[in-house]
């Protein structure tokens, strides 16, 4: 059976703003099933952003588990991420889930994997998914050579990834913290 492919998620932090965005394409084999999927959401009373790459049903399960950890640990992002990673790695059912989560608040960006990894980026951006390397390269170039805010860097870098990666499109959703008046 063919598997669902593709997604690009990018998080960028600059000057007190964090932006997390993703494309909208869902692909099965060589066929685009949907072009406007929403892979980014707000959690914990709107104070945490999360995006996923991988199997959609698996990601929703992980969103629920992560939000439960956020509630349990009063919104502490790093502690909640570590606890989810431990649960994800040790639980026989969760271990089979195929997704990556990128989570962020205004202080931290983290990627969580099913192998128990909780990764904080070296620079103020993090990208995952099939177009992740393209979005990361574009985002880093924009971060280092322009004064654009985080949300505009995220939007533009994801558009560039959508132009290069066949599993990524230009239907971009960007969420920001703190919230801006005009969301992409």
UniProtKB/Swiss-Prot annotation:
GO terms for biological process: proteolysis involved in protein catabolic process. Na(+) binds at residues 162, 165, 168. InterPro entries: ATP-dep_Prtase_HsIV_su (IPR022281), Ntn_hydrolases_N (IPR029055), Proteasome_sua/b (IPR001353), Proteasome_suB-type (IPR023333). It comes from Halorhodospira halophila (strain DSM 244 / SL1) (Ectothiorhodospira halophila (strain DSM 244 / SL1)). The active site is at 7. A double ring-shaped homohexamer of HslV is capped on each side by a ring-shaped HslU homohexamer. The assembly of the HslU/HslV complex is dependent on binding of ATP. It is found in: Cytoplasm. The gene is hslV. Keywords: Allosteric enzyme, Cytoplasm, Hydrolase, Metal-binding, Protease, Sodium, Threonine protease. One of its GO terms (molecular function) is threonine-type endopeptidase activity. This is ATP-dependent protease subunit HslV. Its EC number is 3.4.25.2. Protease subunit of a proteasome-like degradation complex believed to be a general protein degrading machinery. GO terms for cellular component: HslUV protease complex; proteasome core complex. Pfam families: Proteasome. HAMAP family: HslV (MF_00248). Belongs to the peptidase T1B family. HslV subfamily.
